[in-house]
């Protein structure tokens, strides 16, 4: 049986079980109204369906932690409808339905190490590194003076993702991207690229 904890100990990225389904806590808010009992509002993402919900708990409630296994694995390849990962410890192949990791796949690159989440012996999702380094393969050229006004332009990355980058970024540049928000962080020198 899964462990139960006091709702006041909840944290972002914690895995909980709600109505028999696994959820990942996206955000939470402790609310203390002027009248009445304090409560905790939790925003969570269903790890099976990807749907987000909001759950309200009394401050005296306890929640059940979802019994997840987390496995480090390296992304190997993608076929028609699945992504395939090689576990680091056991060197077993794990396959995940492409629909289950649609958002994460935008920044997934061959050889990248990720965390695979396994729930009741079924892989249901992955966690990417917080930031990834990717090459810009397509963007409009920057012009002298563009940077004075600030602003941004779309750029297509080697994984197919399209993000907004500053005007001074050119094709062939290596950029660091936050995988949680999809935002450009910085441009890297080619020598800095791992």
From Swiss-Prot:
UniProt xrefs under SMART domains: EFP, Elong-fact-P_C
Keywords: Cytoplasm, Elongation factor, Protein biosynthesis
Subcellular location: Cytoplasm
Annotated pathway: Protein biosynthesis; polypeptide chain elongation
UniProt xrefs under Gene3D superfamilies: 2.30.30.30, Nucleic acid-binding proteins
Keyword Cytoplasm: yes
One MF annotation (Gene Ontology) recorded for this entry: translation elongation factor activity
Presence of the UniProt keyword Protein biosynthesis in the record: yes
Main localization of the protein described in the UniProt heading: cytoplasm
GO biological process, alphabetically ordered: peptide biosynthetic process
Gene Ontology terms: cellular component: cytoplasm
InterPro entries recorded: Elong-fact-P_C, NA-bd_OB-fold, Rib_uL2_dom2, Transl_elong_fac_P/YeiP, Transl_elong_KOW-like, Transl_elong_P/YeiP_cen, Transl_elong_P/YeiP_CS, Transl_elongation_fac_P
Function statement: Involved in peptide bond synthesis. Stimulates efficient translation and peptide-bond synthesis on native or reconstituted 70S ribosomes in vitro. Probably functions indirectly by altering the affinity of the ribosome for aminoacyl-tRNA, thus increasing their reactivity as acceptors for peptidyl transferase.
Family to which the UniProt record says this protein belongs: Belongs to the elongation factor P family.
PANTHER family: ELONGATION FACTOR P, ELONGATION FACTOR P (EF-P) FAMILY PROTEIN
Cited HAMAP family: EF_P
Protein name: Elongation factor P
UniProt organism field: Hydrogenobaculum sp. (strain Y04AAS1)
Gene that this polypeptide is encoded by: efp
